[in-house]
UniProtKB/Swiss-Prot annotation:
This is GTP cyclohydrolase 1 type 2 homolog. Signal peptide: none annotated. It holds the Pfam family DUF34_NIF3. A divalent metal cation 1 binds at H61, D80, E199. Belongs to the GTP cyclohydrolase I type 2/NIF3 family. It comes from Methanothermobacter thermautotrophicus (strain ATCC 29096 / DSM 1053 / JCM 10044 / NBRC 100330 / Delta H). One of its GO terms (cellular component) is cytoplasm.
Length: 234
């Protein structure tokens, strides 16, 4: 493993996740002074109880809600969109072949060939270790699946695009009541595997990319930011 100047590391990262791919208003980029980087910690979210001793740099997927104590680089929607980035990592983890996009203007999604029973597709989500799976409009067979890393089921416009593109199922996270009703009325199968679970393949790949640069990188999975309680406790 090597030691690298932060500006050189940023230049390498910009090649795999170009900043111009980021969605408008996304708070990506480097925050910190000029440093030498020997050890990197990759996180989905920075939490104040995360031990950062021994690391020179945090590489974060989500922009932090509180300021970390050491320099950090946020790689968010530009990594979701990038060729080989988070959305492609999700499709690869599920064993799906990418064929096109729901939203070619942003590239924040992937449409994949499937030719699977719904049960087979749900079994494949086991590699994501989802806390739960929520399914709207179960069907026996799916031939084309749209996937979005993280937030996709909260976006009604993407659900509308999935329906208009004729996909049989749309898999992502962050499903809420309104989008679920929209999908149900459209007879579109929605599969909510969770924001965290659908983003983890992209985080593993991000760590691998940094190590491919020759820099020591570790990934810490901080999990979902809540605990689930069943009705028996209410």
């Amino acid at each position: 493993m090597i030691t690298i100047r932060i500006d050189s590391l940023i230049e390498l990262m910009d090649r795999v996740a170009p900043p111009e791919l980021a969605l408008p208003g996304d708070r990506i980029g480097y925050h910190g002074p000029e440093i030498e980087v020997e050890a990197v910690l990759v996180l989905m979210d920075y939490l104040e109880d995360v031990a950062v001793d021994g690391y020179d740099l945090l590489v974060l997927h989500h922009p932090p809600e509180v300021e970390p104590p050491i320099p950090y680089l946020t790689v968010h929607s530009n990594w979701d969109v990038a060729d080989g980035g988070a959305c492609d990592a999700l499709a690869d983890a599920l064993g799906l072949d990418v064929e096109s996009f729901l939203d070619p203007d942003t590239g924040v999604d992937r449409i994949c060939r499937a030719d699977l029973s719904l049960e087979e597709l749900l079994e494949r989500t086991g590699v994501l270790n989802p806390e739960t799976l929520r399914v709207v409009n179960p069907r026996e067979y799916v031939d084309r699946v749209a996937v979005v890393s993280g937030f996709g089921l909260s976006d009604k416009s993407l659900i509308m695009r999935a329906w208009s593109e004729g996909v049989s199922a749309y898999l992502s996270g962050d499903l809420t009541h309104g989008p679920a009703i929209l999908g149900r009325n459209m007879d579109l199968t929605l599969i909510d595997a969770g924001h965290h679970a659908t983003e983890m393949p992209g985080l593993h790949r991000l760590r691998e990319v940094i190590e491919d640069f020759g820099v020591m990188a570790e990934l810490l999975d901080t999990g979902t930011p809540w605990s689930e309680y069943r009705a028996a406790y209410i």
